[in-house]
Amino acid sequence: MDIQRPRTSPTLPLDVHRKGREPPRSRSQTFEELVAGQPWGVRNQRWLAARSVLGPVGATLRSADSLRRAQGRLLDRAGLAPQPAPSRIQLATPAFRLRSYGQATGAGRPVLIVAAPIKRAYIWDLGPNASPIRLLLDAGLAVHLLEWLDPSPADVDAGLDRYVERISAAVDATGDTPVLLGHSLGGTLAALFCARYPQRAAGLALVEAPLHFGSDAGAFAPVVAASPPAEWLQEGFGLVPGVFLDVVTAAAAPREFVFERYADLWTSAMSGRLRLHLQVLRWTMDECALPGRLVADVVEQLYRKDRFHRGELVIDGSRVGPMTLTVPLLNVIDPLDDAIPATAITPFHEAAASPHKALLEYRGERGTALRHIGVLVGPGALTATWPQVIDWVANR
């Protein structure tokens, strides 16, 4: 009997830069070309190769996550643990908890804070002197915080759709029509919910939350363009370790997340803000993995294809984009932020169908360890920016 030898997979030409040949526009295209049009067996071999490489790396990174959390607990013993305001659990699920603050009745406009699923939600309430939540409470608002929990292996396939579904459950649990408030990726998720279900929100206040993606949308764009398809991360990692996201962030914006952080340590010591710097540093050690599908959706659907800004993203069976965001809209931008610059926000803001729109600027300050977090914890932000945000929220 003749034995058929397996076909070898075709290789890419090595002369892509020779005269007359168009070089690939980005590494992402090259990776896609590796599998495009090839037999299923070849494609499957490449997925298995990704898993065999990333699997052991993932185990190492998960150990690094555990080590960093242990380091954080040591800092807790040094007096740097968060000091949150009293709250109660309004809703508990395996994926998130809804915390409610203040009086259940007689409070003012309800506000639902959608925390970013990266790191921990207590950055919104580090302590008495670094807490937007306490400022909202002092203004008489009914405050709720959607706090994401560590994803389980069953959550690997939880993408943007699932996260919007969970926000929907949290909105229901507030028992009212709240203003949604979010920072960074938490704000992006809140925007997706409001664009899909505008009738269920009284307004949307976003703090340095990316809405427009693509080549002109900040430091992450070149990293995404030079990366293989993000589904490889889902296949290789399952749950993407927090340390991996730290490395990607530092590679994308080293000035903001590496060099300026160390410079801020020195200036914090000189300006009497060392404790705040160390509190934020302790928070950065509270690593949290993300579902592989969520990472893949953010990278592919948002950053690579900019589908939300283009109005091409489908959430719960319907397209969402600027044209479906019809709730009052507030955006806080930092024009000097490398990670989420104004160009990642203002094009969407201008295109949004919201009848009432407002734009505020925050230009950073020393003593907050990370510029991107300064708007949540900085004394300047809390005394100058947040009173304007609260006034806007209270008048929805």
Which stretches of residues belong to each language-model region?
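Short beta-strand/loop motif that positions the catalytic acidic residue
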Residues: L325, N331-I333, D337
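Catalytic active-site module of serine/aspartate enzymes centered on a nucleophile-bearing elbow/loop
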Residues: P355-R396
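Conserved acidic catalytic loop of the alpha/beta-hydrolase fold
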Residues: L149-P178, A191
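Short alpha-helix in the alpha/beta-hydrolase fold that links the catalytic acid
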Residues: V327, P341-A351
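Short, surface-exposed "cap/lid" segments of acyl-processing enzymes
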Residues: Q83-S152
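Short beta-strand immediately N-terminal to the catalytic nucleophile in serine-hydrolase-like folds
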Residues: L180-G182, V207, V332
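Alpha/beta-hydrolase-fold enzymes
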Residues: M1-S52, G175-D176, L189-R293
